[in-house]
Amino acid sequence: MGTSYGGYATLVGLTRHPELYACGVDIVGPSNLETLLRTIPPYWEAIRADLYRAIGNIDTAAGLAQARERSPLFSATNIRKSLLIAQGVNDPRVKQAESDQMVAALRAGGIPVTYVLFPDEGHGLVRPENAIACNALIEEFLARHLGGTAEPISAEEMAASTAKIVEN
């Protein structure tokens, strides 16, 4: 379970070592390093060189191959366990398309995925109502897949959030 890089790390773990996981939770984590780098906002331009050093220069064949090899999207069919993905629609850093393409790949492979969108959030959850709803959904998801318990969220609390569970 993780947010941003932690979400990416969760996806990497699930794709490279699926036997070690009972389930996973990815919150605003990138799934495709190529599209992540191609959508760098203008105010991040100053750190592009650092990102290319860490991920690979996608303007070169070798760098693009490296970025793709490190991208969970291209190994999504290796995932064997259920995944919950939460994404802010207005995320300027990890665009919704990162999660959309991962969800599509998982569903195409018959892998169970719960996809929760927050239309009024960005890179993380700021509104307390959304954080409460997301945490409750995660708690219920983990209880179901790990065999624990979860405190149910009330209908009023869920309705106060903007969480949208995206079905097939």
Segments from the language model and where they lie:
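Active-site-proximal cap/loop segments of hydrolase catalytic domains
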Residues: 1-168
